[in-house]
Amino acid sequence: MQLSEFDFPFDPLLIAAHPCLPRDHARLLVLQPLNRSLAHRRVDELPKLLQPGDLLVVNNTKVLAARVAGRKRPSGAEVEILFVKDLGDAIWEVLIKGTCRPGQIIEIGAEVSAVVVERGATRTTVRVESPIPLSEWLRQHGRMPLPPYLKRAPTDQDREWYQTLFAQHEGAIAAPTAGLHFTPELLARLQQRGIGLTTVTLH
């Protein structure tokens, strides 16, 4: 079996490159549990689709602006780094586009660089050299790690658009996208309907 067997034709314009406004007007596909039928609805219809006493579990992870452009020293060749996970002691797990060997120094900003520690098929780690914690530097200078299928460059507006209403605990490199469609008005209507809400942190 080839992966290409799962390809199918579709109009790329159907991929939403920007969020629906208002957010809760996004389309929602509903599976009816009794007869297994499908219904096309909208997210703002959730209060009447759920029952009093139901519980919504939402992810309160916050997306870190973890994508940066860098230059290899001394060649100046450009590379892109996505900082995936802080492993402690200034060591980060990363994804790097481009060829890099252990020991390679990548400049990513004034007085900020990453030295490749391990470069493997499934894992790459770097040691960050920075006068301030990298997470703090990324908040100021990093770009939001938009999904590649959006095929557009991130904007300053994405720092707001690509966070959910529940975002509290920084650490994600991708938004829990279902949560992007909730608004304060929708939450108020769910609460009035007697629908509970609890949070988990997954990133």
For each of these PLM feature ranges, what is it?
Residues 1-203:
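A cross-family signal for N-terminal binding/gating loops and helix N-caps
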